[in-house]
Amino acid sequence: MFLVIRVRGTTGVIKNIADTLDMLRLNRISHAVLVEDTPSYNGMLQKAKDYITWGEIDADLLAEIIAKRGKFTGNNKVTDEYVAENSDYKNIDELAKAVIAGEVKLMDLDIKPVFRLHPPRKGYEDIRLSVKEGGSLGYRGENIKDLAERML
């Protein structure tokens, strides 16, 4: 499971890349979504790599993101009580583990698929360079945790 974050804006985006970003539901800067590690999603990530960054997410970070930035229908915050009432899981931590394992999707519980994060504290490295070149774009692997924690 990947966490995908949009880094760059909409100005000058080629139409097919803009369509890919729309399919990923990344409409604004600092929005984040979860995607599965499938060949079709990998192709979409490679196509939009000059506007996004992504990496593997673990259950602890996902639980923190859901608790702080998760919203359900009506723009209400996701709480342990909401998860216990509307699912088979007792709290957000158990839900996060189930989402990572692929047992359940956030949409099944009416949790919005897009997380609206803050811009990162201390800023991005460089929004025009890849991670390998010292920038912020492209595949990060496990280092997505550092960026996501700065954005919560």
Curated annotation (Swiss-Prot):
CDD domains: Ribosomal_L7_archeal_euk. InterPro entries: Ribo_uL30_ferredoxin-like_sf, Ribosomal_uL30, Ribosomal_uL30_arc, Ribosomal_uL30_CS, Ribosomal_uL30_euk_arc, Ribosomal_uL30_ferredoxin-like. One of its GO terms (cellular component) is cytosolic large ribosomal subunit. It holds the Pfam family Ribosomal_L30. Keywords: Ribonucleoprotein, Ribosomal protein. The lineage of its organism: Archaea, Methanobacteriati, Methanobacteriota, Methanomada group, Methanobacteria. This is Large ribosomal subunit protein uL30. One of its GO terms (biological process) is translation. Belongs to the universal ribosomal protein uL30 family. One of its GO terms (molecular function) is RNA binding. Part of the 50S ribosomal subunit. SUPFAM superfamilies: Ribosomal protein L30p/L7e (SSF55129).
